[in-house]
Amino acid sequence: MMDLFKAIGLGLVVLLPLANPLTTVALFLGLAGNMNSAERNRQSYMASVYVFAIMMVAYYAGQLVMNTFGISIPGLRIAGGLIVAFIGFRMLFPQQKAHESPEAKSKSEELADEPTANIAFVPLAMPSTAGPGTIAMIISSASTVRHGGEFPDWVIMVAPPIIFLAVAVILWGCLRSSGAIMRLVGKGGIEAISRLMGFLLVCMGVQFIINGVLEIIKTYH
């Protein structure tokens, strides 16, 4: 049972900086300004469902994609590390706010014409929460844990859905409490937390690259 708790804790530590629900909160507040309370709650719930579904598909279909295209684990680690480090760097030194992204601008224009337009999948679920970095991390981590032997097989079966469900529930809670969160920490607080998470992502991405290079050296030495 301790192995299960350890796996869940490790998964949340790895995924939450990438998912970064607080950034999604800021985006949600910018896009849902004209929605009533019931519609906001519905969008919050649907965004969480979409995030859970995207993560599950990435985890279970990732190995199939790797086998189909002949992608090695070291190659995936290096590519995933580059993506994660790049996303972290952009969070450390943002060139644009979350609500100024192309996806958010496109959805804002759609909302101007149709105030009840769906914002749950794009941009809240993807790319804001379960974006390329999150998907790359999930696929890479799936390959690592399956071949690493660090956790028992039953933990590897049970832990991922629980981790993804926990991330989805955290996102849902943040979106439902978006107004209170914004009043509590403010835009400056969200920006500071995002930069801290960005630094962690840069470190994680660099470590992924190092691990991939070391594995290549070990394989071909």
Curated annotation (Swiss-Prot):
Spans within the Periplasmic topological domain: 1-7, 67-68, 140-154, 218-221
Localization per record: Cell inner membrane
Record field: transmembrane: 8-28, 46-66, 69-89, 119-139, 155-175, 197-217
This protein's UniProt keywords: Cell inner membrane, Cell membrane, Membrane, Transmembrane, Transmembrane helix
One Pfam family cited in the UniProt record for this chain: MarC
Topology of this chain in the membrane: Multi-pass membrane protein
Keyword Transmembrane helix: yes
Residue intervals annotated with topology Cytoplasmic: 29-45, 90-118, 176-196
GO cellular component: plasma membrane
InterPro entries: Multi_antbiot-R_MarC
Domain of life according to the entry: Bacteria
Family indicated by similarity: Belongs to the UPF0056 (MarC) family.
Protein name listed in UniProt: UPF0056 inner membrane protein MarC
Annotated organism of origin: Salmonella typhimurium (strain LT2 / SGSC1412 / ATCC 700720)
